[in-house]
Amino acid sequence: RHIHVSQEDFRFLFGEDAQLHYTKELSQPGQYLCQERLTVKGPKGEYQNMALLGPFRKETQVELSLTDTRKIGLPGVIRQSGDTTGSPGCTLIGPKGELTIDHGVIVAKRHIHMTPADAVTLKVKDNDEVFVLTKSYGRALIYADVVVRVDWSYRLAMHVDTDEANAFSNQTEPYGVIVKFFDGNYNTDKWIEDVLSGINR
């Protein structure tokens, strides 16, 4: 769980002269963990000391797992990063004030970052949806609906939330195999219905 914050909201919560303080680099170039922390409050609970990621975004976005959203009483809306229209809001509590946002809380859709060169090698393209088969110890998983995100600024990495990561019991050698069906354009629910219809005939 983490927060991307706009500069305007950050200054309201931390003070007009406050700045983000770099702690460490993240998997994607230019993205970093910050020293600053916020409390995220929903109708039924709150999470304290939630990490902020830099740099500033145009719009504040809170990313939680489905378990997290249930704990604080918010609907879990699965979206790609940046797609926050119609998502639930929350209250952000900082050292200098409280701010209620009317949208911006999402459960991030699982995705893979890669460069255009990676995409050519892996035979995928931007916004394809693929399956990822993972190696594990008694709990191998097949992740479906994994969005491919392609840009020269990215570094090859798959991002899942804590719920998805905890279901996958391989912390020492986490890797997966990308499998692309239907030219990367499919609807899992429809596909499952078709399979079940065939079984039930």
Regions found by a protein language model. Give the residues of each.
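Short, charged beta-turn/beta-strand-edge "cap" motif at the junction between a beta-strand
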Residues: 98, 136-139, 182-185
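Short beta-strand-centered segments at strand-helix junctions
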Residues: 1-43, 48-95, 100-133, 144-175
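Helix-rich terminal scaffold detector
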Residues: 191-201
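Mixed-charge, glycine-accented linear interaction segment located at domain edges/termini
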Residues: 167-175, 179-192
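Short, well-ordered secondary-structure micro-motifs
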Residues: 143-144, 189
